[in-house]
Amino acid sequence: LDYRTRYLDRIIEVPASAWDSLLPEHPAAGLVSHGMLAAFEEADCLGPQTGWEVHHWTLWDAEDNLVAAMPLYRKWHSYGEYVFDWAWANAYARHGFDYYPKWLSALPFTPISGPRLLRKHNDLMIMPRMLADLKALDGSSAHCLFSDGLNESDLKAMQEASWMRRTGVQFHWYQANYKDFEDFLNALSQSKRKKIRAERRKVNEQGIRFEHKTGADLHENDWAFFYACYERTYRMHGNAPYLTLAFFLRLHESQPERSVLFLGHDELGPCCASLLFRHKDRAFGRYWGAIRDYPFVHFEACYYQPIEWAIREGIQCIEGGAQGQHKMARGFDPAPTESWHWLRHPSFANAVEQFLSKEGLHMEHLLDELQEHRAFKSVR
């Protein structure tokens, strides 16, 4: 077939209807929608000034129909990725080579597994074409982070093109026909159940009350308060926040049903907030913060309130985001993730391949070990 590649400096160069027509049936497909990617760009979270240059890959047929697309960025650093390659960059620098710029296909600042290559139909030539196009770009390497939904043909094409798989682990909560939160607690071991009840009791004794809002119930003042919490959390760790208030307002404007905000109140008013993204029967824990600090409120806002809500709403899974082994004590289970990497320099590619082989074995052992320390009773 006669395909033509075109790179986009802005997602709005293609109609939302054309881009979104490529989204597959996947729990996280909505997170690579036109509206989500546009929110990052239009709110100035991306661009040359941030070290994220938009360069989305698109493929068009002879009739000028969009047949495939992939979010793509030219990166001048490794911030906001949650798959860590700083050591690779340092190794390049020690040997006098430039690691940056590199090419990255990912959902910016968001460690959620999902589709990256979007296709109208399953033409077996699309994946090899995309890989060849990336190789032709000027840069040290290309990376596809938190990729999910690849088929056997995709895997074969990536391996033949010398792409390397890297595994990681996150922690997800799964619905198991729980009727309510108490039913969920009863599935846990006694020690974990006791600990959670104690933590919730202490939050209650401090006079913290929670509500959740979504869709039309969310107003600009709710977002302004959430952003104050979000920004304070980043500043307390000595970092500037990646996202702007305009991003959240833009996302709410285009996809009001996407966000679920949990708000904690003390006697002075709102004191903390956590934000989840929702897509169909799956939820994704994203951000948390507080303007006044209380013990155990983080667990209530980020885990217990969302789990209660998920059981009521028929949500089948809450993805807990990056890292956080402490989530296991609160009923989250380990879940593997994968990313793919291609390095142009043969010697560095060989070294990274050996490193990833060892790291992969370590991750296998870690996942096995984590399974043995689940919070649930041995017979569930």
Name every feature range the model reports, one short phrase each.
Residues 1-380:
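N-acyltransferase acceptor-side catalytic subdomain
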